[in-house]
């Protein structure tokens, strides 16, 4: 067997393999024998068709099958001996039987050969969130909103109130547009952006007042419309009294007292923002490494991440993209992100390789025990059994290896903590 490896690009290679008759003839004979068992030719009993006749009838199919099998076999052997790191399946470009030789050409993508730039001087900022009593009360108010009551008020509307109003639409000449009157329209001011024209016009208005709102066309030359809004009612959310009975109802009797409920809310906030702090740090780390290491990415690897992003989007949208959203257009929009995912995978794999990182059974056991400690409802032994199963083993290995890679990075760079207030959210 002779071989010749040609580098097409940083991520592409071609492999030329030349086999002698001694190497491919046994495979030809095996294919002929297998065909003899099933082929039926007039004038011959099944299983007794001469080899020459079989080669005459099935020659091209037999040669194609032999070329495929030998290409696969020798590609594996050569990849191991030459330390080739394929990033895709090898494609059989062409083959030819020429007397006593079989020539095969394979094309495939490879992981690029590169080194990660030194990162010991990198500096990152990690946001640290301290949960205050005020944060806890805000969160409890958000939770109890679903049990609140909207009550009419005579005072001017505030930024979180709801306004019930009638609307009439006018064209830019001041004429009422036929069929464009809406009655009892509900404006929830809390969820309207502060720069929304209706939000600006309605805050401070009372029941019975009228206001005009001009809506400019989004595109140049597009018509401007005017709305006349008659405020019929201003409603304000009145939260229920937080007591033990309400706590039982909200928590489905998980908690009996306000104090226990408040403690749980604080704990969940602390856990959520601790996770956010860590996740934001890891994202900033990967972004910096991607920026500093413009590693060429195999297109097959990028394709894989592109497919993942597409399927994730479909799941979030009920199983398919919305009508009118072009799949090819969506793929084009996420392609740069898919390339970043692929580049970070290559970089992180190189860091793992440089530091001889691996995941052992003991690592998985420790991970299961740690998860069980965080959640008393989980059993460490049952969890370990799940993690070690065929379905979960690869996922757990990837998860733990990722943790080890980030641990190596964090131990080498500078991380400055910065205290931050909890970000506002409306629930």
From Swiss-Prot:
<keyword id="KW-0143">Chaperone</keyword>
<dbReference type="GO" id="GO:0003755">
    <property type="term" value="F:peptidyl-prolyl cis-trans isomerase activity"/>
</dbReference>
<dbReference type="GO" id="GO:0015031">
    <property type="term" value="P:protein transport"/>
</dbReference>
<dbReference type="InterPro" id="IPR008880">
    <property type="entry name" value="Trigger_fac_C"/>
</dbReference>
<dbReference type="InterPro" id="IPR037041">
    <property type="entry name" value="Trigger_fac_C_sf"/>
</dbReference>
<protein>
    <recommendedName>
        <fullName>Trigger factor</fullName>
        <ecNumber>5.2.1.8</ecNumber>
    </recommendedName>
</protein>
<dbReference type="Pfam" id="PF05698">
    <property type="entry name" value="Trigger_C"/>
</dbReference>
<dbReference type="GO" id="GO:0043022">
    <property type="term" value="F:ribosome binding"/>
</dbReference>
<dbReference type="GO" id="GO:0051301">
    <property type="term" value="P:cell division"/>
</dbReference>
<dbReference type="GO" id="GO:0044183">
    <property type="term" value="F:protein folding chaperone"/>
</dbReference>
<keyword id="KW-0697">Rotamase</keyword>
<feature type="domain" description="PPIase FKBP-type">
    <location>
        <begin position="160"/>
        <end position="240"/>
    </location>
</feature>
<keyword id="KW-0132">Cell division</keyword>
<comment type="function">
    <text>Involved in protein export. Acts as a chaperone by maintaining the newly synthesized protein in an open conformation. Functions as a peptidyl-prolyl cis-trans isomerase.</text>
</comment>
<dbReference type="GO" id="GO:0043335">
    <property type="term" value="P:protein unfolding"/>
</dbReference>
<keyword id="KW-0413">Isomerase</keyword>
<dbReference type="InterPro" id="IPR027304">
    <property type="entry name" value="Trigger_fact/SurA_dom_sf"/>
</dbReference>
<dbReference type="InterPro" id="IPR036611">
    <property type="entry name" value="Trigger_fac_ribosome-bd_sf"/>
</dbReference>
<dbReference type="GO" id="GO:0005737">
    <property type="term" value="C:cytoplasm"/>
</dbReference>
<comment type="similarity">
    <text>Belongs to the FKBP-type PPIase family. Tig subfamily.</text>
</comment>
<dbReference type="InterPro" id="IPR046357">
    <property type="entry name" value="PPIase_dom_sf"/>
</dbReference>
<dbReference type="Pfam" id="PF05697">
    <property type="entry name" value="Trigger_N"/>
</dbReference>
<dbReference type="InterPro" id="IPR008881">
    <property type="entry name" value="Trigger_fac_ribosome-bd_bac"/>
</dbReference>
<keyword id="KW-0963">Cytoplasm</keyword>
<dbReference type="GO" id="GO:0061077">
    <property type="term" value="P:chaperone-mediated protein folding"/>
</dbReference>
<keyword id="KW-0131">Cell cycle</keyword>
<dbReference type="InterPro" id="IPR005215">
    <property type="entry name" value="Trig_fac"/>
</dbReference>
<dbReference type="GO" id="GO:0051083">
    <property type="term" value="P:'de novo' cotranslational protein folding"/>
</dbReference>
């Amino acid at each position: 067997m002779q071989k010749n490896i040609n580098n097409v690009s940083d991520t592409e290679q071609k492999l030329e393999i030349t086999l002698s008759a001694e190497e491919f003839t046994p495979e030809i004979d095996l294919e002929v024998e297998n065909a003899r068992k099933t082929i039926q030719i007039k004038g011959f009993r099944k299983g007794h068709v001469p080899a020459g006749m079989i080669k005459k009838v099935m020659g091209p199919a037999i040669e194609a099958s032999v070329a495929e099998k030998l290409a696969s076999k020798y590609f594996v052997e050569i990849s191991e001996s030459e330390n080739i790191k394929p990033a895709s399946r090898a494609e059989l470009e062409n083959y030819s039987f020429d007397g006593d030789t079989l020539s095969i050409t394979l094309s495939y993508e490879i992981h690029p050969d590169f080194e990660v730039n030194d990162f010991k001087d990198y500096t990152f900022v990690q946001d640290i969130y301290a949960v205050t009593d005020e944060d806890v009360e805000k969160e409890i108010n958000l939770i109890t909103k679903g049990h609140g009551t909207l009550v009419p008020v005579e005072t001017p509307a505030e930024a979180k109130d709801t306004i019930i109003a009638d609307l009439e639409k006018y064209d830019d000449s001041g004429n009422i547009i036929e069929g464009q009157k809406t009655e009892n329209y509900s404006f929830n001011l809390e969820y309207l952006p502060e720069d929304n024209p209706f939000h600006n016009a309605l805050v401070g208005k009372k029941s019975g007042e009228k206001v005009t709102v001009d809506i400019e066309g989004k595109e140049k030359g597009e018509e401007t419309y005017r709305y006349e809004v008659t405020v019929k009612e201003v409603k304000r959310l009145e939260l229920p009294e937080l007591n033990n009975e309400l706590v039982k109802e909200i928590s489905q009797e998980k908690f009996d007292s306000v104090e226990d409920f408040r403690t749980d809310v604080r704990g969940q906030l602390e856990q959520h923002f601790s996770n956010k702090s860590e996740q934001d740090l890891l994202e900033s780390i990967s972004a910096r490494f991607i920026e500093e290491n413009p590693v060429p990415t195999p297109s097959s690897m990028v394709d894989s991440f592109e497919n993942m992003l597409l399927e994730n989007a479909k799941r979030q949208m009920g199983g398919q993209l919305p009508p009118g959203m072009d799949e090819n257009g969506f793929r084009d929009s996420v392609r740069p992100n898919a390339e970043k995912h692929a580049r970070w995978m290559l970089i992180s794999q190189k860091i793992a390789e440089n530091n001889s990182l691996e995941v052992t059974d003991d690592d998985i056991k420790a991970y299961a025990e740690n998860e069980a400690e965080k959640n008393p409802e989980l059993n460490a032994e049952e969890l370990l059994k799940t993690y070690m199963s065929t379905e979960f083993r690869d996922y757990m290995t990837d998860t733990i290896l990722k943790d080890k890679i980030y641990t190596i990075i964090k131990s080498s760079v500078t991380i400055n903590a910065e205290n931050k207030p909890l970000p506002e959210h409306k629930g």
